[in-house]
């Protein structure tokens, strides 16, 4: 761990330093704290950096001066990630040119780009770090052994982000289970969940969400899709809603990786989920409220709401939807329609494969996995501009975040593109870390927490030396 001495000209507001779940409390990663840094590198504006053993793409969460994150340590070698989204497809094309049959091609792709359960023995850890220093307060091993399913080499075995209510940390790992710990690291309970196959052994990623006394999860897999609620005090299942969505013929793509969203709107509070080809919203007892067909077969971006509308990214080649509160039944758009009584607008070319958009200062900023960046009016759906961040922007998995009139886009190589908020595209600068990056950052008061493959960084605007 590296630690830099800082001069603090005041006390940070403790309440502003809470980041309780994936993408923050409102599932829209923005901040009004003007002290947050615009520039950083592995040496610039680094308050501290702490090496994190193993690998995990879960985001850090923050509560009461503590940071929590998960990781998996592998006995022996593990397949390292590789940037980009098309390299497996390119490999398939190369093998097809060699005249290999489909079975042999699939065997070679699985051997090169996937890690299967029998190939690895894992130890799953929850880490607690001190927010001010980065020092490890404690770590707890909560599971071990061969994983219940495989992963694509770009995924991790702990891609789900924990959630906290300020009293306990709730850790969900897809196909493994739920675990609860207090802030001193004492395990409160554990609840195993059934293991179901994921499409082509891609692995899992959908994080849990919390509302009141319940933890909500979604498991869209190849065999038994479901959404479920658990009592946060005991870990006991409260309800389960089985789902049957996605393709039933051909590729049978029935898996998804989206994190659900608790939408507290003027009509009611509901659990919004996005699965293969279909989005479904439930009330908090598991009763279906509405559904929308027309999303991608393998969705990854997560829904969120701001300004009275729910924003739902349909995925690559699909629309971006803005949904009004109070929807009921099937709200699918008719052929050629862009809106209806429940859907305020759609932007047909703005669905993307991986990153979730961010809403900031009246606009949605949409980042595609290849670096195409768009601004859309959040109220009307009007496209303001669409631009390429840079001719050599690289590939993007991390969702953008925003503060201080800037939008931040972190690519998989660790380079952040800083774009001015507003109606005209303006790239202000880039910040380089030179480390593989796929975890969405956390914002804690005046600190930006960025997790790379090897390290957790706390970036903070440097003050005058003491």
Each language-model region and where it sits:
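Sec-dependent signal peptide recognition
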Residues: 1-9
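Hydrophobic h-region of N-terminal signal peptides that target proteins for export
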Residues: 8-16
């Amino acid at each position: 761990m590296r630690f830099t001495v800082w001069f603090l000209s005041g006390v940070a507001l403790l309440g502003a330093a809470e980041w309780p779940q994936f993408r923050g409390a409102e599932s829209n990663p923005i901040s009004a704290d003007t002290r947050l840094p615009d520039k950083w590198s592995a040496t610039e504006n680094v308050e501290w950096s702490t090496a994190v053993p193993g690998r995990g793409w879960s985001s850090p969460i923050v509560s009461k001066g503590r940071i929590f994150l998960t990781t998996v340590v592998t006995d022996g070698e593990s397949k390292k990630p590789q940037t980009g989204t098309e390299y497996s497809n390119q490999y398939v094309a190369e093998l097809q040119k060699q005249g290999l049959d489909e079975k042999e091609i699939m065997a070679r792709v699985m051997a090169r780009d996937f890690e299967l359960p029998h190939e690895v023995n894992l130890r799953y850890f929850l880490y607690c770090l001190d927010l001010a220093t980065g020092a490890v307060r404690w770590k707890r091993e909560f599971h071990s052994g061969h994983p219940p399913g495989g992963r694509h080499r770009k995924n991790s075995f702990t891609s789900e982000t924990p959630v906290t209510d300020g009293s306990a940390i709730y850790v969900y790992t897809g196909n493994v289970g739920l675990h609860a710990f207090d802030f001193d690291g004492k395990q409160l309970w554990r609840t195993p969940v059934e293991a179901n196959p994921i499409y082509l052994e891609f692995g899992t990623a959908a994080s849990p969400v919390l509302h009141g006394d319940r933890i909500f999860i979604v498991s869209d897999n190849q065999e038994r899709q479901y959404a479920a609620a658990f009592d946060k005090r005991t870990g006991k299942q409260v309800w389960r809603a089985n789902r049957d969505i996605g393709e039933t013929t051909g590729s049978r793509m029935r898996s998804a990786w989206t994190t659900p969203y608790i939408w507290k709107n003027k009509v009611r509070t509901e659990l919004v989920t996005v699965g293969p080809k279909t989005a479904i919203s439930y009330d908090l007892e598991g009763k279906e409220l509405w559904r929308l067909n027309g999303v991608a077969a393998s969705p990854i971006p997560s829904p969120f709401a701001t300004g009275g509308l729910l924003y739902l990214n349909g995925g690559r080649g699909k629309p971006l939807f803005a949904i009004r509160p109070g929807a009921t039944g099937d709200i699918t758009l008719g052929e050629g329609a862009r809106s209806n009584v429940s859907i305020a607008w759609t932007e047909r070319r703005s669905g993307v494969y991986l990153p979730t958009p961010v809403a900031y200062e009246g606009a949605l900023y949409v980042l595609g996995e290849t670096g195409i960046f768009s601004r859309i009016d959040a109220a009307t759906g009007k496209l303001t501009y669409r631009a390429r961040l840079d001719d050599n922007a690289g590939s993007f998995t991390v969702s953008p975040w925003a503060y201080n009139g800037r939008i931040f886009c972190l690519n998989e190589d660790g380079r952040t593109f800083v774009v001015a908020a507003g109606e005209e595209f303006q790239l202000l600068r880039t910040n380089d870390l030179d480390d593989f990056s796929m975890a969405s950052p956390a914002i804690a008061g005046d600190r930006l927490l960025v997790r790379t493959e090897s390290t957790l960084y706390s970036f903070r605007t440097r003050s005058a030396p003491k």
